[in-house]
Amino acid sequence: MLPEIQKPMSILHHNVTTHNIKLDGVRAEGETYIIAFHQVLSDLGNYDVLIGGRYFDEYEKREGIWKFSSRAVDADWAYTADPSKVNLSHPMIEGANIGAPDSSDPSYAYLKNFKRGER
């Protein structure tokens, strides 16, 4: 499902911030704050969506390993810019690598131990 969602996006940048977990034996609940930026490609012109929200997670310990058992997504706010305000030629990022939501992302070359793309 995620690759289908990603098709119209040239930039996806999700930040996980505050993460609170409450344990109860072999079960746990978590609330995780997120900020997610997306630049969406459109025939009418690219636009940006910045979302602040939370994940409501449930976890279970199975055979000694903690795993997700469910997740709900909450959107607390959203900011849009139409047309897109992304400027990858701004002088402040001159000389920086530019990320991409696919195997052309610089992390594939720099982070060999992650073995990105391998299944």
Predicted regions and their residues:
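A solvent-exposed, acidic/Ser-Thr-rich amphipathic alpha-helical stretch
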Residues: 1-38
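Short beta-strand edge/turn micro-motifs at domain boundaries
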Residues: 29-31, 52-84
